[in-house]
C-alpha cells in the first residue's frame, strides 16, 4: 500500500508538471513580453529567496528556471522552422554554440550520467543561451525593445530594493570583514555580483540614446513623426525633459553599484565609461568636453575622499579596493585556479571540442581541492566546447559589436552591453538574465535589417493601436467632409469670425 501511495503521488506530481509545462509553453508562444518577464522574474525570485526550490525529479532536480529555459528553446526552434528563411550570420553563430552545448551534454550524459551533465550545463550554458535564442527570434513588433528594457529596469528596481533591505538588516561592511550572524559567516554584500551588473547595465540603458547613426533606427526605436500643424518644439522639449528625468535613477543605480563592492562590476563600469566616451562624436569638441567633465568629477571625488568626508563609507570602500592588490585576493585565487585547470592532460579532440559536461573542475589551490566552476567564461567554454566553441563565441560578440555600430542600426546602449559581457567573462560565467540582453542585441539587428529591406518583415513593425487610431481619424475626417459637402455655403469666406455650421440646413 505504501508503494502504491508513493506511485500515486509521483503520478500526480508528473501530471501537474506536464500541465504547468503546457501553460508555460502557451505563454511563451502567444505572449512574448510576459515570457521575458518570467525569465527575468525567476532570477530575481531566486536571489530574494536564497535559491530555487526543485519541484520535480526527472533524473536530476528540475528547477523553475530549467522549465522556462526548455520552453524558450522549444518555441525558438519552432519559430526558426516556421520562418523558413535562412537566419542572419550572428544568429547562425548562436545556433552553432547551442548545438555544441547540446552535443557536449549528450556526451556527458553517456559518460557521467544525466545528473552530473545537467548540473554542469544548466546555468551558464543552457539557461543563458536559451534566453538569448528566445529573445533573438521574437516576432518583429513595434515597441518590443522598449518593453524588454522596461522589464529589465523593473528587475533592477527589485535588486535595488533587496540591496537596501540587506543594508538595513546587517549594515554596510567591507568585503574584507568576516561578519557572522547566528554563528554563520555571511557575505557582507546583500546581493551577488549578477544583481550589481544588472544595476550597472540599467544605468547604461537609461543614459544612452536609443537610436542609430544618421537617425535611421528601427521602428521599435523610431520617434513618433510630427504631424502637420504639430508643435514640434513642445514635443522635443518633452523628450529632453524625459531624458533629464532618467539621470537621477541612473545615478542611483551607479551609487548602489559602488556600495555593493563587487570589484568586477566596478571594472565593467569603468570600461563601459571609457568605451562610451570613445563613441561620443568628436565634432564640436563633444569628446573633449566629456573628458574634461569626467576628469574634473574624478578630481573632486578624490579630494573629498582624501579629506575623509565620506566617513565610514569611505573606509569601507577603501578596504574593498585595497583587497584587490593583496597577494591573497580573490582575483589572485582565480588566476591560480585557471593555471591548474590548463595544466590538465588534454588530447587533440579535447582541445578542439572540449571535455563533456560533467567532467568536473577539480584543482589544487593553496593546498585545498576546489571543484567550483572556473570563474572565467572564456576558460569555461574552452574546457567544455573547445577551441571551436570559444572561437564561435568570440566571433558572435565581435560581429555584434561591428554590426551594432553600422550606419542605420548603431545603438550605443547595446554596444556597451556587448562590452560589459566581454569584461564580465574574464571573472565570471554569464548569468541567465544576461541572455535576455544578448538576445535583444540580436533582435535589434533583425529589426534594423527588416527596416532597410524593401519587403520588410513578415509582421510589420507598426503599432497596431496606432494604426487603429489612424483609421478612426480617417473615418471621422471622411464623415465630416461629407457633412460639409452637403451643407449650403451661406457664410462669408472673407470674414474671419464666420464659422461653418456643423448642423445640416433645414429644408422649408
Name each model feature, range by range:
Residues 204-205, 413-425, 430-471, 477-480, ...:
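Transmembrane alpha-helices of multi-pass inner-membrane enzymes
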Residues 62-72, 90-105, 113-137, 147:
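Aromatic-anchored transmembrane helix interface
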Residues 23, 130-131, 146-174, 188-280:
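Alpha-helical transmembrane segments of multi-pass inner-membrane proteins
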Residues 223-228, 236, 383-421, 447-448, ...:
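Hydrophobic transmembrane alpha-helices and their immediate junctions
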